[in-house]
Amino acid sequence: MRGQSLPALSQSLLDGLRKHGMRERSPARISVDPLANAPADIELPTTNILSAPETILQIGSGAFLRGFVEDFVQLANIAGDPVGRVVSVQRKSDHRSAAFLRQDGLYTLILRGLENGKPVERKRIIASISRSLSADTEWSKVMAMAVRPSTRVIVSNVTESGLALGASDTPNDQPPLGFPGKLTQLLRERWQSSAGRDADIAVVPCELVENNGSMLSKLIDEQARAWNLSATFLDWLRSSVHFANTLVDRIVAGAPPPEKLEAEWQALGYRDDLIVCAEPFALFVLEADEFVHQHFPNGKASPGIRFVDDLTPYRVRKVQILNGSHTILGAIGRLLGLRTVRQAIDDRQLGKFVDSAICEEVIPATERGDESESAHYAREVLARFRNPFIEHSLVSICSNCSTKVGTRLFPAIRSFMKRRGVVPRRLLFGVAAVMLLLRESDVEDTHLELIREMWARVDDQSPDSTLAFVQQLLAKQVEWSREHIDLQAIAPEVATFLMKIREQGLRATMES
């Protein structure tokens, strides 16, 4: 049976799965029904979820949020800690929004990996999303959701590059282009509609930026002042909008590669155009006040959610070890012609290089003297990279890598230099690899056009020209990431790596 002939995931199909008693693992099946092909171990959402109120407005509808936040929301609702459902907002209507409509917001989450050295697989139909909206064409509906008293949480994942003011945004745009402008407008509407009474709301950003909630709060304040919004509104922002600093940790690969998608549908017994694959491991750390704790999933639903007084040690380990090594693996791996994280980490030379970068440069720079915990986490990370069940594309990891260099590598470089007094050569090789990737490969990056204009002015035979380019791009990466770095100390080493790679090749330079 081809995928096109399978029944599509929808509310009616979900009702049919319940009829077959799948949640109770009932053996009663009707063989002539196409649902008889569905496996009996799919975890179904409880019926109370489908009637739950919409309480969470989510800016972003990508695979990560669907494989992470929505999973925690469903677990909380099932566990009797109801937090409501999600209204998902994406920038414009496309094939994904059409699939959301066609599938009644439902999709399958497949978790595959190793736990205690043994393979595990879990399949869940996620019903956390009630509907999907387009910001470009349905902004009035997004605004209506923002002003509802029942809306208590706004979640976002616009990537690091999205946390920047839109230079041309105005308070009357429908909608503003930049995310801070969108959020400021939504919060202003909520404040105006309620006259500031009983309108408290939590903002839970999932971007991989240090103190992301605090940063977003400052951006909203800055945007409001730029728009000359009232002092009363600014006071309300400070008193009634509860920003959480967060750390998110789960490898979400997204949809299976096209050559494997048909087999997944056959195994499920139905067609799902929104299927998400991820690892079982999930950690969501929040540094937030009591309001966020009351209205967002907490540890009652899953041990993967932790509310803490200080998430710094979690963030340092995760961003510098997992995300930093991802950035290095992605850039070098793609330059070597590799396709997935597992291929990259299993490449003997590259795997050894990344392991050495973590153990000899990142962990020694770990603050607060928790090197043993960092070493344990690093071993877990490398094992997760080798997950045989996850096809984590290097292309997706490398998106917006020009900004990720600053947020993921600069802190470790800065800390290493402070503690050791020398530059971390492997991390700087990773910086050089990202620069080269942005010149030579097809990369989805907000700043790609500018960077390629900068590359076009480089004389490859001139060390001075290469150094000037490196200094210029590093300065831009400091600006984009808001992460300070000693440019004069690291630029010569990065430029030298670029020259050597051109003369000797990538592998020979990596070995030197």
Regions found by a protein language model. Give the residues of each.
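Substrate/ligand-engaging "lid" and interaction regions
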Residues: R2-S512
